[in-house]
Regions:
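S-adenosyl-L-methionine
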Residues: 1-55, 60-67, 91
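Class I S-adenosyl-L-methionine-dependent methyltransferase module
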Residues: 71-175
Length: 175
């Protein structure tokens, strides 16, 4: 479980639609995007400053609570939702620079090919898989929010690149 630092003094209730529009959209089973207006009302009516988001998924509920000035404790069974939440709700303005992106998308540092070997013929082109292997070779040396932000960016890019959703696999959609 990760503690998301407080956003400072409690801000006025945020506009849930604005929060949803700012938050990176991820097609995720059980996503709470549609519930944000109701969750905002409930959180606004509750006393206290701490919100638990035990099944954080896309992280949008944690982000909403954070924008409302709440301290957030977020967790998930899977690792990637925790990374998404740390990169968004726990990120105090860190952004990847152009140099970071050039490094991340640059040459493979150590020749790793696990992703290419394991996922060949599934979901992505060989070129896409090689980019992911290369990015992971760079990420091995990165730490903290910068690393979380880079991984979150790769997760979101991969989710958009695979338009059929994360639970469909193998063959191209149209011959």
């Amino acid at each position: 479980m990760a503690a998301i630092p407080e956003a400072g003094p409690r801000a006025p209730a945020s506009d849930a639609e604005t929060v949803a529009a700012r938050y990176p959209r991820l097609r995720y089973m059980g996503s709470k995007y549609a519930l944000l207006p109701q969750l905002e009302r409930v959180l606004g009516d509750l006393a206290g400053v701490t919100v638990a988001d035990p099944f954080s998924g896309s992280g949008v509920v944690s982000y909403l609570a954070h924008t409302m000035g709440r301290e957030v404790w977020a967790s998930d069974y899977l690792a990637f939702p925790c990374v998404l939440t740390r990169a968004t709700a726990a990120n105090d303005g860190v952004r990847l620079s152009e140099e970071d992106l050039n490094e991340l998308l640059g040459p493979n540092r150590d020749g790793r090919s696990y992703i290419s070997r394991t996922y060949s013929g599934i979901l992505f082109t060989p070129e896409d898989l090689a980019v992911l292997d290369s990015a992971w070779s760079v990420l091995a040396a990165w730490e903290g929010v910068r690393r979380d932000l880079a991984i979150a960016s790769l997760i979101l890019a991969a989710a958009r690149k695979q338009p059929r959703g994360v639970f469909t696999v193998t063959a191209p959609r149209y011959p």
